[in-house]
């Protein structure tokens, strides 16, 4: 008997329909359970799906697996029926998000934003800029994104230090973080949102960063205390590159928009050409492992 999989879009329908032993059923995110969908054993929510998708999970009595298309699972942990497995698309977006972070650092150090303004104003502002070469980089978070970030920084001869929840080969434990922060020219956040990481970048964390250092948030907005960061930016002591904010989307009248020393993008780090295909490639692999009774590679265990 075929396993029913609920799919949110046509890209997924094509990808999952190619699997043997699967009956892929298209559903409209936010809409009711489609005909034939009530027997679904696997649910694939859409990108950045919200509360409506989470509510759908409770309407599927045979549901056993929720397969996400994102690396982040904070919207789902603790909010799904007991006994239902939760798997992410870790590995699908790391390369493009690391590319975003690298671009942000280069933009700040080489002053591309300032040169773009000068171009619009027809001003020839030739001068020396800073460089990423040789900068000391601290990556907070030791997952797929951190590994991609480390690879992309290698050609710039940047000493890279990685911090994870526990110490292991090539990774420092989080207990060492307070002593490592002051030595970093740039701090890149790649952690998931958990009870331990929400607000971890607070006033004390930022105060440990040396003058002129750059904070790069490639993680999630709630990891950073916005008011604390805004205070440091307003004082022109630190700089920042943000792809995520808290709140998000950022209200049009929020003071963060006009903060000096800030490069801000609207949560597009993983949004590049081919991102959907990469996410479904990971999802299909996880679904295949589930059907074969094999361990899932991206299974969320506890808070993850």
What do the PLM-derived regions correspond to, one by one?
Residues 166-255:
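Rossmann-like adenosine-cofactor binding region
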Residues 115-148, 175:
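Glycine-rich NAD(P)-binding loop of Rossmann-like domains
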Residues 1-45:
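N-terminal glycine-/charge-rich "phosphate-binding" loop or analogous flexible N-terminal tail
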Residues 155-170:
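NAD(P)-binding Rossmann-fold cofactor-contacting core
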Residues 41-116:
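Phosphate/diphosphate ligand-binding glycine-rich loop within oxidoreductases
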Residues 100, 104-128, 276-278, 282, ...:
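A charged, well-structured terminal subsegment
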Residues 87-92, 96-100, 248-304:
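C-terminal helix-to-coil terminal segments
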Residues 54-62, 78-82, 205-211, 232-236, ...:
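Short, conserved loop/helix-junction motifs that constitute active-site signature segments
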């Amino acid at each position: 008997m075929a396993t029913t999989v609920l799919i949110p879009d046509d890209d997924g329908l094509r990808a999952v329909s190619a699997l043997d032993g699967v009956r892929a059923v298209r559903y409209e995110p936010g809409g009711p359970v489609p005909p034939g969908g009530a027997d679904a054993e696997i649910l694939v929510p859409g990108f950045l799906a919200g509360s409506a998708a989470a509510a759908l999970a409770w309407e599927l009595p045979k549901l056993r697996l929720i397969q996400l298309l994102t690396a982040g699972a904070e919207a789902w942990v603790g909010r799904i029926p007991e006994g239902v497995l939760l798997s992410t698309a870790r590995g699908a977006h790391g390369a493009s998000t690391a590319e975003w972070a690298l671009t942000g650092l280069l933009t700040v150090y080489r002053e591309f934003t300032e040169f773009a303004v000068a171009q619009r104003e027809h001003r020839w502002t030739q001068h020396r800029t800073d460089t990423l070469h040789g900068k000391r980089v601290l990556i907070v978070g030791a997952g797929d994104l951190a590994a991609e970030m480390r690879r992309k920084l290698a050609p710039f001869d940047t000493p890279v230090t990685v911090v994870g929840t526990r110490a292991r080969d090539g990774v420092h434990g989080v207990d060492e973080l307070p002593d490592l922060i002051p030595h970093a020219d740039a701090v890149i956040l790649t952690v998931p949102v958990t009870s331990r990481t929400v607000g971890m970048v607070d006033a004390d964390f930022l105060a440990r960063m040396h003058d002129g250092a750059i904070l790069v948030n490639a993680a999630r907005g709630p990891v950073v205390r916005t008011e604390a960061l805004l205070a440091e930016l307003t004082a022109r002591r630190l700089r920042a590159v943000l792809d995520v904010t808290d709140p998000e989307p950022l209200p049009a009248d929020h003071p963060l928009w006009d903060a000096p020393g800030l490069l801000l993008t609207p949560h597009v780090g993983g949004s590049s050409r081919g991102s959907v295909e990469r996410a479904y490639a990971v999802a299909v692999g996880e679904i295949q492992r589930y059907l074969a009774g094999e361990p899932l590679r991206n299974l969320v265990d506890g808070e993850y």
